[in-house]
């Protein structure tokens, strides 16, 4: 029963949160995609001439939140005992304490909130109006609280909510940087499978340079260089010599893994002074960092997190509200049309691929100087591929990819926390949480979003 409930719970979490990401992306379709639809209508319509993106978005609108409400009810049937939530950090302006709540009551209450929000979303969908953001937020938050109450029911410890959320944000940092790198590359028409190698290269170079200079700040300046080098190799073989970009990306990942492994075993193992565990200082924003719950999570972080906020905000605006963004998207949607109006497609793709590599390399620094760890072989552990999944689930948009990355980070954080508090959920189920979430998300949503029309297509 516990295993079945866990699977249903995870499916509900994934589909509820990602449905909103997909719907938002489809509702905000940009002018470049409109031009591409006019130029190549067969790519975007089915046999009857119906826009497939609109069909997918409509389906998600109508089902959004329904499974979450039903799954919350099932969890309430299996919940026994109480759950204690720790809501306070030591530096908060005021302490909220650690209330002990009846697990079944919490689940039923949140199920009611989810059901009400679902009704609003369904009504707005029926009238072909945009679903309000607050409804999607309530569905996501309500279901997360229900899942935590169910998982912690009858456990020996407390649910450290602030710790879980802080850990989720930290774990999502390299995923966000990686997904932004993927967005820039693929929006300009280049498939960037080499994100894993760029993250690993950034982690390696950041650790070595920081150790050599005894300064972690220098490390985050060096890390993007590794990402740019990998990106330029991808541009050389994938764009200049027209080798299949997916194959080149995979080969580069293997190359970086082998090269960093060789350097680690040959030089770093015998010279510990070049591989020290240096950490960037935590920077607290005055007053904001002392707000209960959200303050420690959002405003007591390292510079890498604050740069991540800025990168998402700037890219969200520049990608759709600037001349640079229009040129970039034109190269990814219809490079021939872009060339016709005087845009150098090759130069645009190479330059933006280098920018993407710099972002991914900076994200790789999180594994070493951002976390206070020394470099280890393959320490990125496939995060580059998960970042690609976040990019797809976010419909190639910065805010959508941020939400998907946070979801994956939250799943990993929960998997790390539940065994510590003595949760009654099977340890086998707990260890599977991050992978189940990734598989469910990709399987459920990857066919319902559209990639840039000319991604992976060499030009000229």
Task: Please give the residue ranges for each predicted region.
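Pore- or pathway-lining transmembrane helices of multi-pass membrane proteins that form conduits
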Residues: 174, 240-265, 274-276, 308, ...
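Short, non-helical or kinked segments that cap or interrupt transmembrane helices
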Residues: 184-205, 217-220, 239-252, 351, ...
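Helix-loop-helix "hairpin" substructures at the membrane interface of multi-pass membrane proteins
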Residues: 298-375, 398-399, 403
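Short loop segments and helix-boundary regions at transmembrane helix junctions
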Residues: 122-132, 185-191, 230-287, 321-323, ...
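Transmembrane helix-bundle core of multi-pass membrane transporters
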Residues: 86-97, 257-320, 375, 423-430, ...
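Inter-helical junctions in multi-pass inner-membrane proteins, predominant
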Residues: 25-26, 32, 156-160, 165, ...
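Single transmembrane alpha-helix segments in multi-pass membrane proteins
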Residues: 115-118, 163-213, 220, 229-246, ...
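Cytosolic-side transmembrane-helix boundaries in multi-pass membrane proteins
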Residues: 1-28, 32, 38-89, 108-149, ...
């Amino acid at each position: 029963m516990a295993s079945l409930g866990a699977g249903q719970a995870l499916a509900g979490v994934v589909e509820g949160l990602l449905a909103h990401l997909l719907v938002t992306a489809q509702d905000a379709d940009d002018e470049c995609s409109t031009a591409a639809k006019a130029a190549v209508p067969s790519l975007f319509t089915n046999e009857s001439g119906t826009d497939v993106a609109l069909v997918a978005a409509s389906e998600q609108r109508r089902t959004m939140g329904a499974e979450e409400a039903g799954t919350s009810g099932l969890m309430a049937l299996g919940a026994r005992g109480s759950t204690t939530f720790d809501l306070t950090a030591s530096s908060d302006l005021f302490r909220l304490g650690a209330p002990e709540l009846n697990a079944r009551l919490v689940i039923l209450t949140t199920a009611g909130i989810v059901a009400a929000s679902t009704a609003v979303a369904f009504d707005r969908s029926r009238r072909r109006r945009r679903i309000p953001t607050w409804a999607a937020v309530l569905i996501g938050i309500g279901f997360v609280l229900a899942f935590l109450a169910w998982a912690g029911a009858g456990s020996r410890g407390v649910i450290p909510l602030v710790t879980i959320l802080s850990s989720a944000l930290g774990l999502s940092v390299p995923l966000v940087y990686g997904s932004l790198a993927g967005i820039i590359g693929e929006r300009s028409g280049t498939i960037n499978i080499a994100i894993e190698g760029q993250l690993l290269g950034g982690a390696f170079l950041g650790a070595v340079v920081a150790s050599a200079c005894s300064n972690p700040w220098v490390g985050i300046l060096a890390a993007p260089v590794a990402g740019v080098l990998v990106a330029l190799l991808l541009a050389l073989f994938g764009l200049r010599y027209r080798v299949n970009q997916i194959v080149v990306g995979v080969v580069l990942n293997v190359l970086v893994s082998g090269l960093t492994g060789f350097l680690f075993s040959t030089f770093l193992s015998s010279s510990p002074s070049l591989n020290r565990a240096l950490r960037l200082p935590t920077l607290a924003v005055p007053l904001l960092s002392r707000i209960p719950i959200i303050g420690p999570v959002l405003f007591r972080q390292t510079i890498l997190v604050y740069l991540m906020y800025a990168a998402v905000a700037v890219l969200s605006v520049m990608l759709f509200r600037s001349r640079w963004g229009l040129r970039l998207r034109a190269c990814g949607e219809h490079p021939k049309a872009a060339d016709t109006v005087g845009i150098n497609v090759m130069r645009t793709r190479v330059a933006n691929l280098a920018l993407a590599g710099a972002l991914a390399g900076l994200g790789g620094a999180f594994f070493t100087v951002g976390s206070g760890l020394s470099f280890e072989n393959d320490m990125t552990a496939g995060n580059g591929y998960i970042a690609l999944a976040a990019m797809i689930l976010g419909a190639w948009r910065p805010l959508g990819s941020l939400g998907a990355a946070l979801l994956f980070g939250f799943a990993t954080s929960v998997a790390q926390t539940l065994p510590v508090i003595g949760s009654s959920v099977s340890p086998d189920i707990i260890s599977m949480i991050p992978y189940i979430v990734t598989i469910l998300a990709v399987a459920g949503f990857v066919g319902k979003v559209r990639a840039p029309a000319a991604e992976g297509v060499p030009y000229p």
